């Protein structure tokens, strides 16, 4: 039957292929009594080790193909497998109740899932999904059942699923998987972000694709408009084949812009930079003509290991990045651990609301030995290129002043040791807390630059967790309140002669770009694959014309009105 389903455009492009329905199998686990406890423990240990091997391989594959930030979720899954509460709980059931490993795994994981899902905090609820995903993998090894890997698909398909886990998305083979559509998800969900890195057309949040589509149905996924067509007519197939060809031609045109500067129609230069997680990610920045790195997430140096990285390890990583960028600006964010990123070896206490808790600069100012080691490595690397330092999650001037004072102390120590340090390192802050945006005029006097972290700024301003499906409709980048905060930050910085960048998903959003350009944003930092489309868009825009347009948008009532105004005026 013919259906037209609308959802959220997550990754641009057009896919036309037969549907592959990806549903999780339900496996009934029965409780059985055992007599040989040691054999059962050995079986569990083997399943845990095989699961770790798989996750390490997936993590490495994801890091190589999509960057360290996309691989972060698998480091979290590995931490679950090493969690003594979970592992010892399962072993305890086997030893004390003489039950089979499969049922012990089910009982303990179900208990943790129920506990996390009952909490009010959305971050803790997300941990339930991690435990469910990891437990499914371990169970598969215990009972010898394939856990539904999509890596084995060997014909052209469009995947239809309720949702795709990070493990699922990381294993997609672009040669055969032409696109996907899901019932749930938003533009900032894991699967959406990964689909953009892989350049696979995707539509998410449709609410009904699994209900309306049968295995083998012909499907069109329009990741440009957010439309899924089931069993299309010949005319629709022809029209979308033309649309797909036009999009591929457009990509070829974008490729010609790799060595070109990012200038507007009226000759204004805007810096298009990239977000990275490891030195390896610089490959993608250079291949896509990035003019700098607007966010180097240093926490990936600290993850998937059992001890803190040394000063020397960090120095080598930072040095490699600034050297390879050959004088182009590299903004390096100091450690942002906490919230959705944990380090097992720090043994931080569990928090009910870690996103608003002991994280980022708050952790660094308390655990100064960690902070000072990182700052020494950054200061040493500063002589090898255009390195800038950025402090995350700054809420007060006192935090900023303390961080700068510690950095100055470490600089003085290095100089006294005869170590060269650049005398022109710019220091800035992430603006991701609404109070910081409102007080930007105060901060602007004491920093060299701002970088607006919209992913957190939006969810904190709208009081809506971007990963929570039930309130995802409130995650509105174009909401007048968000635009006014951005405007406030830019004006405050410019009044002090300072520059402003943006390093959230919003920076690479084609609807947001005209607004941000009109508001005067100086630097747009995005995923490397978004740089060339953004550069192409800038060539068609006039910065001077956009100034009154952006101010007009600030006066509108709703995010929808803002979006429609931009689309009607600039995205016809």
Swiss-Prot record:
Nucleotide-binding in keyword set: no
Predominant location category: cytoplasm
Compartments where found: Cytoplasm
GO molecular function: kinase activity; metal ion binding; phosphoenolpyruvate-protein phosphotransferase activity
Catalytic activity: L-histidyl-[protein] + phosphoenolpyruvate = N(pros)-phospho-L-histidyl-[protein] + pyruvate
One cellular component (GO) term of this entry: cytoplasm
InterPro entries: PEP-util_enz_mobile_dom (IPR008279), PEP-utilizing_PTS_enzyme (IPR050499), PEP_util_AS (IPR018274), PEP_util_C (IPR000121), PEP_util_CS (IPR023151), Phosphohistidine_dom_sf (IPR036637), PTS_EI (IPR024692), PTS_EI-like (IPR006318)
PROSITE patterns: PEP_ENZYMES_2 (PS00742), PEP_ENZYMES_PHOS_SITE (PS00370)
Highest taxon of source: Bacteria
Record comment regarding domains: The N-terminal domain contains the HPr binding site, the central domain the pyrophosphate/phosphate carrier histidine, and the C-terminal domain the pyruvate binding site.
Family, per entry: Belongs to the PEP-utilizing enzyme family.
Protein name (database record): Phosphoenolpyruvate-protein phosphotransferase
Species this protein is from: Halalkalibacterium halodurans (strain ATCC BAA-125 / DSM 18197 / FERM 7344 / JCM 9153 / C-125) (Bacillus halodurans)
Gene: ptsI
């Amino acid at each position: 039957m013919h259906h037209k389903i609308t959802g959220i455009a997550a990754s641009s492009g057009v896919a036309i292929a037969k549907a592959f329905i990806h549903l999780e199998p339900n496996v009934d686990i029965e409780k059985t009594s055992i007599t040989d406890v040691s054999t059962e423990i050995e079986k569990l240990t083997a399943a845990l080790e095989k699961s770790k091997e798989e996750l390490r391989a997936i993590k490495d594959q994801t890091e190589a193909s999509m960057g360290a930030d996309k691989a972060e979720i698998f480091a979290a899954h590995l931490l679950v497998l090493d969690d003594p509460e979970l592992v010892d709980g399962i072993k305890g059931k086997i030893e004390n109740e003489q039950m089979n490993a499969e049922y012990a795994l089910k009982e303990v994981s179900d208990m943790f899932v129920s506990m996390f899902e009952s909490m009010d905090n959305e971050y803790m609820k997300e941990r339930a999904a991690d435990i469910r995903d990891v437990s499914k993998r371990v169970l598969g090894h215990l009972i010898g059942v394939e856990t539904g890997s999509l890596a084995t698909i060997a014909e052209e398909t469009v995947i239809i699923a309720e949702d795709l886990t990070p493990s699922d998305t990381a294993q997609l083979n672009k040669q055969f998987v032409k696109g996907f559509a899901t019932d749930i998800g938003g533009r900032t969900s894991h699967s959406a972000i990964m689909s953009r890195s892989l350049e696979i057309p995707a539509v998410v949040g449709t609410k009904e694709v699994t209900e309306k589509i049968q295995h083998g149905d012909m499907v069109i996924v329009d990741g440009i408009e957010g439309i899924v067509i089931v069993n299309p007519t010949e005319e629709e197939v022809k029209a979308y084949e033309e649309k797909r060809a036009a999009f591929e031609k457009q990509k070829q045109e974008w490729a010609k812009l790799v060595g070109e500067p990012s200038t507007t129609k009226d000759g204004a230069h805007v810096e298009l930079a990239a977000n990275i997680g490891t030195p390896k990610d610089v490959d993608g920045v250079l291949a896509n003509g990035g003019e700098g790195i607007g966010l180097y997430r240093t926490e990936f140096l600290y993850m998937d290991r059992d001890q803190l990285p040394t000063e020397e390890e960090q120095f080598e990583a930072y040095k490699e990045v600034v050297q390879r960028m050959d004088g182009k600006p590299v903004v390096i964010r100091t450690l942002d651990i906490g919230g959705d990123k944990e380090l097992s070896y720090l043994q931080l206490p569990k928090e009910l609301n870690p996103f608003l808790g002991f994280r980022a600069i708050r952790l660094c100012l308390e655990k100064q030995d960690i902070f000072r080691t990182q700052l020494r490595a950054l200061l040493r690397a500063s002589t090898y290129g255009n390195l800038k330092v950025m402090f995350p999650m700054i809420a007060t001037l006192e935090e900023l002043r303390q961080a700068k004072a510690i950095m100055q102390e470490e600089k003085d120590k290095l100089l006294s040791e005869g170590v060269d340090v650049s005398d022109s390192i710019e220091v800035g802050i992430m603006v991701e807390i609404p109070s910081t945006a409102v007080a930007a005029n105060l901060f602007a006097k004491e920093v060299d630059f701002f970088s607006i972290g919209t992913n957190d700024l939006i969810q904190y301003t709208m009081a809506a967790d971007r990963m929570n499906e039930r309130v995802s409709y409130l995650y509105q980048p174009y909401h007048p309140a968000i635009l006014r905060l951005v405007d406030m930050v830019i004006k405050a910085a410019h009044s002090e002669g300072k520059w402003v960048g943006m390093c959230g998903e919003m920076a690479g959003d084609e609807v947001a770009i005209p607004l941000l350009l009109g508001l005067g944003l100086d630097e747009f930092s995005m995923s490397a694959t978004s740089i060339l489309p953004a550069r192409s868009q800038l060539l068609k825009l006039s910065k001077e014309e956009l100034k009154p347009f952006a101010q007009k948008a600030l006066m509108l009532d709703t995010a929808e009105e803002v979006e429609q105004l931009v689309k009607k005026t600039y995205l016809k």
